[in-house]
């Protein structure tokens, strides 16, 4: 999925004093990709409801997969479905199983059932977006649907993609009704087409060709009506607009401290081959199991042959000052900084539960589960845009791609690879897209409110990481101030626990139409929750969390981050709030219930809050016992 650090076309613009994005390739072609966002219709049964439901107690089977399967059968009695092969047991002991609904042997691409099974084998919670309407006749008998090549041409025409498809031909991949489209140009790899159903915004089922095109600025799944090729029913973008002499971890940007030489900074549990190896190869360039970093001044899709510094002694120490210009004079330092920041964050997220089984980004998973061969491609000085950054998140087993652009709002221009908050924000898109819906399903955050939560998670994680030793809940933080050369930053308000400094509340979302403004509301709520937990447990100012016997971080900052990671799911604020509360039940037995509720309620997401896409109802009420 693709989300940006800044708003692109079709999104609400930021305040006039803040920088705006040049947009992505589709923006420049005047196609509003947001008009094609999928709608999100789902239910979520939280842990409190699940434990009180007598019928769920009888579903327990020998293992978590059988238990989850029985739940789907009991809830969706007439549905056909398949298990998505990305199930795993998280670091908190909760098993996660994902199911995909099928019809006539074809996937219903946006019909998912996500189940969490507790340590004792009981149903902990679940989310369900299965289609409940009538199933049409089997289209594979008459085969009166369009050709996949024609579907590619339709997507290319309607979205104004830069793909040449006149000589394209379809070759079967061997999977059911799935084709590689050969003979094209303009895409990073051969486009693919798969025949699937899609639940449309009106609730009806449509037979579509899901056409996958990676054109660098956008990595798209386009759902083209298979009957007519005249209508696009939805678009998912895997990319996300907006990562060892370095600014050390914890320094957000050059204004917060000086560069230093760090030695062997990796966590050997998360990066057992160090950052420079894959278990079979050791590199003398910024490349390893988790990432490969390079400059990309032409903005192209190639990266293996691009420039990156080489050191036979693995001493990546290069000069950089704020006065250096042009960027080519400090490219070695930029590549090194990006590689460092992305790797530290990889290791931290691994400790918080985003490991191999959960779908993280690694070449060699070393037998720990999940799909490998998917390190993050890190492009600094990317020439395809300015004043932004982005991250493309395909499903587990395919590399993520981060592109860091130069910002021209100061003289000399500033390099986004030197602002850790931007790198962390972008990498968090990879985290949230892999965790929400399962590692094999990266298109669950495409609706407006869920897309906003994706942006908010990125801002929250970046802000939590930059907290300093002397900070209290009175400390405010902006986002992107250095890179934008603007003390106000790139968001409407700073992150603050003061309702005067940042007045955002849940009902503000009713009047917001962009993922970034919506994300600011969500991150503000998470900031409140974090400070409630810090006030209770204190703050660990080290680079890594310390865990108690129950597997929970012992301090408030890392506990908040752990709960956010464990609770990443679901399409709207109310359900995501419940998921964080459920994550706390799984991790601590619900010890922090009231601290979490108070943080959300302060910002209008209390127990009486209700979701509606057009008329959200706010509430400052707390549940009984708080």
Curated annotation (Swiss-Prot):
Main location: secreted
Active site: 426
Any Pfam family: FTP
Cofactor note: Binds 1 zinc ion per subunit.
Region ranges (Disordered): 606-626
Record: residues binding Zn(2+): 425, 429
EC numbers for this chain: 3.4.24.-
Polar residues composition bias: residue spans: 610-626
GO MF entries: metalloendopeptidase activity; zinc ion binding
Statement: the UniProt record of this protein carries the keyword tRNA-binding: no
Cofactor: Zn(2+)
Glycan-carrying positions: 315
GO cellular component terms, A-Z: extracellular region
InterPro entries assigned: FTP_domain, Fungal_virulence_M36, Peptidase_M36, Peptidase_M4/M1_CTD_sf
Disulphides: none
Regulation: induction: Expression is controlled by the prtT transcription factor.
Record bears the keyword Ligase: no
Subcellular location: Secreted
Function: Secreted metalloproteinase that allows assimilation of proteinaceous substrates.
Similarity field: Belongs to the peptidase M36 family.
Protein's name according to its UniProt entry: Extracellular metalloproteinase 1
